[in-house]
């Protein structure tokens, strides 16, 4: 799922030198090479389960959902803090519950192609496209899409508040493009507000190993379906586009003491789930339900 992830800028320089004294002369030694502050290899796996709840239209019954996502990227240094990033991703939704004719799964396999400015492992500005196939079962030419996003970060108050602006879109997205962004407020050394949509968060880091946060998520992805023949008979479509969304609020904690891995666990409420067949003006909504999540990230 494509979203517009953005982070704050914190620039620093480091240098070291040493001098060895002789009887009458001093010889300067070359400064050691500073360690790489940005990871080159990025790995992420996530699974999120939303428990069963009813459709707004009772004839459709009930549904639960399981979301899985795997991605791997590698950064290639261009110059300074500018990188070219390339990678792959596979994501999949599986739906259980009533056999009502709606898709029982949706999936996507895509590439990542990006140019970004990276500071301390955080993307401060960049542009990315994710070309790939977004489909139900059949991989075909009309299942190809290329979601894109562009973003930039700027200081509003030195070392305290930053503004983020961004846009994103896709060929089969509705609307075809949408804004994102917000502000980052460094409240203290341990507390910050990342008011960045589509994934705002209030983050507390008591130390280098623990990360606690209250989060929100707006997740929207469009897929090419096969036959959609619902039991209520108002929705009978072939080869249609559906924009599926899951919007959540919750809390999560992460532990990064096992370098280079970060282990993440979270829970909350999926407040809205929806199958939006926008070209046919048909939406199928599902009531709120609790969710649980586990994830693992690695940067090296």
Task: Describe each PLM feature range.
Residues 22-147, 239-248, 281:
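Transmembrane beta-barrel domains of bacterial outer-membrane proteins
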Residues 43-51, 86-92, 127-133, 165-169, ...:
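Transmembrane beta-barrel strands of outer-membrane/channel proteins
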Residues 59-64, 103-105, 135-143, 168-177, ...:
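Solvent-exposed loop/turn segments connecting transmembrane beta-strands
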Residues 61, 92-101, 198-271, 275-276, ...:
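Outer-membrane beta-barrel translocator/channel fold
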Residues 71-73, 112-116, 149-153, 182, ...:
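Outer-membrane beta-barrel architecture
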Residues 74-76, 117, 154-156, 169, ...:
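Residue-level signature of outer-membrane beta-barrel architecture
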Residues 78-84, 121-127, 159-163, 190-193, ...:
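Repeated loop/turn-to-beta-strand initiation elements of outer-membrane beta-barrel proteins
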Residues 181-185, 190, 253-259, 286-300:
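Outer-membrane beta-barrel "beta-signal"
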């Amino acid at each position: 799922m494509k979203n517009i992830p953005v982070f704050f800028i914190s620039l620093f320089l480091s240098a070291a030198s040493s001098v060895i004294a002789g009887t009458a002369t001093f010889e300067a030694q070359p400064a050691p090479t500073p360690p790489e502050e940005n990871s080159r290899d990025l790995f992420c796996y996530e699974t999120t389960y939303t428990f069963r709840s009813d459709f707004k239209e009772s004839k459709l019954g009930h549904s639960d959902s399981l979301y899985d996502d795997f991605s791997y990227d590698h950064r290639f240094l261009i110059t300074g803090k500018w990188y070219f990033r390339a990678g792959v991703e596979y994501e999949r939704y599986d739906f259980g519950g009533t056999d009502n004719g709606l898709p029982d799964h949706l999936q996507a396999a895509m590439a990542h192609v990006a140019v970004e400015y990276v500071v301390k492992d955080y993307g401060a500005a960049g542009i990315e496209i994710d070309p790939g196939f977004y489909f139900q079962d059949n991989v075909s030419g009309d299942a190809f899409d290329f979601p894109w996003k562009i973003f930039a970060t700027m200081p509003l108050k030195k070392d305290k508040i930053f503004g983020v602006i961004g846009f994103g879109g896709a060929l089969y997205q509705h609307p075809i493009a949408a804004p994102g962004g917000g502000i980052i407020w460094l409240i203290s050394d341990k507390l910050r507000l990342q008011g960045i949509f589509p994934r705002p968060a209030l983050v507390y880091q008591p130390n280098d190993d623990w990360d606690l946060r209250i989060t929100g998520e707006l997740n929207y992805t469009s897929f090419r379906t096969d036959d959609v023949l619902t039991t209520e008979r108002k929705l009978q479509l072939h080869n249609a586009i559906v924009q599926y969304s899951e919007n959540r609020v919750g809390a999560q904690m992460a532990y990064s003491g096992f370098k280079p891995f970060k282990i993440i666990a979270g829970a909350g409420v999926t407040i809205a789930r929806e199958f939006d067949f926008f070209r046919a003006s048909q939406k199928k909504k599902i009531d709120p339900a609790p969710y649980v999540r586990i994830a693992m990230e690695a940067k090296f």
